[in-house]
Regions:
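Protein-protein interaction and targeting regions used for scaffolding, dimerization, and localization
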Residues: 1-16
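Terminal substrate-recognition subdomain of acyl/acetyltransferases
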Residues: 16-38, 59, 63-73, 103-212
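Glycine-rich phosphate/pyrophosphate-binding loop shared by adenosine-nucleotide-utilizing enzymes
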Residues: 48-64
Length: 212
């Protein structure tokens, strides 16, 4: 519990890194569209070149989001996080922009459907419980999730879909079922998230958003 409180305090500190901090560091956020619905979002200079750990700037980071594949399931047309990394204090702004982009072009944003670290899960817990400007939407199991839980988990778990007549919200829950068994739907990782484009609007107004 103490570690969780410390993490939340750190996350609140990170969330304070806003547009003014970008201006102070002369850094931009670039949204690079790759394919129809795949995006790379990163901190950059004014020419859209990514900042890195080797630059003089202390601001660097990126997040990659992609449309779900056939194995993952429709996921309510949400885009999935497939990679995220940033300098300390600069992660939340990238996540917010990624969520806003994913909301505009699809059904929002979901965590990585294959593997999520404990620290990353805490980020999603924070979105679910502490961010009033973020909306969560429950996703469902896939047939593969149900089959795997009954055959391979010890002891076996008999699961049922929440919305058996709706396929569009099916989304791989391998990570949540393995960790939470029949309470998988209580996990922050079992959902998709949407958000109004307030961060992107602020970045545009400050001339700090590059869209390729």
């Amino acid at each position: 519990m103490k570690l969780l409180r410390e993490y939340i305090r750190a996350l609140l500190k990170e969330a304070a890194m806003g547009v003014d901090a970008l201006v102070a560091n002369d850094v931009y956020i670039t949204i690079d569209k790759e394919g129809l619905t795949d995006y790379l979002i990163y901190y950059s200079n004014k020419d859209g070149i990514p900042t890195t750990m080797t630059d003089k700037s202390d601001v660097h980071g990126e997040i990659t989001i992609m449309s779900p594949d056939e194995e993952t399931g429709p996921c309510g047309e949400a885009l999935n996080v497939v990679y995220a990394g940033a300098a300390s204090g600069w992660g939340p702004m990238l996540y917010d922009v990624a969520m806003e982009v994913a909301t505009q072009v699809g059904g929002g944003l979901t965590p990585d459907r294959n593997s999520v670290s404990n620290s990353a899960e805490n980020v999603w817990n924070y979105y679910l419980g502490k961010r009033g400007d973020v909306q969560s939407h429950q996703l469902d199991l896939t047939d593969k999730d149900i089959d795997g839980a009954s055959k391979y988990m010890k002891p076996p778990v008999q699961l049922q879909k929440l919305t058996p007549d709706i396929d569009e919200d099916d989304c791989s829950q391998k990570r949540t079922v393995r960790a939470h068994r029949d309470e998988w739907d209580q996990s922050s990782l079992s959902k998709r998230y949407t958000k109004a484009p307030t961060t992107m609007s602020a970045l545009r107004a400050a001339g700090r958003l590059i869209e390729k």
